[in-house]
């Protein structure tokens, strides 16, 4: 079983991968950031979208990349858009760094692929091909 999604579907995919041993690989497009960056107003967004995803009390102990990292050492692909207004690159890069540290500590850094593509908040044909290639490589 693999989990894949874009936007809120991506959020669900990495959450499911982190919490279920049945999921053997995961792909998430346009949903990874650190909470501190997502909930700030300094990026000029009218709506920062993070409050809907804040699990009460959990942020005291774990941030989004910490939760996603519970999936290590599973093969996981994260794709972000460099012009995605919902997920500022500062937070994406910070989250990716945290996750790479965990996969590295698990001896499986090669199982984590993180990308920042020239795109907005979308799952385009290039992303879909990357997902299919990643899953073909990791779950066949």
Where do the model's predicted regions map?
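Short, conserved active-site loop motifs that form the nucleotide-linked donor/cofactor pocket
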Residues: 1, 76, 112-113
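Alpha/beta-hydrolase fold nucleophile elbow
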Residues: 1-7
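Short glycine-enriched nucleophile-adjacent loop
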Residues: 10-21
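C-terminal catalytic histidine-bearing segment of alpha/beta-hydrolase fold enzymes
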Residues: 51, 97-140
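Acidic catalytic loop of the alpha/beta-hydrolase fold
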Residues: 83-87, 121-122
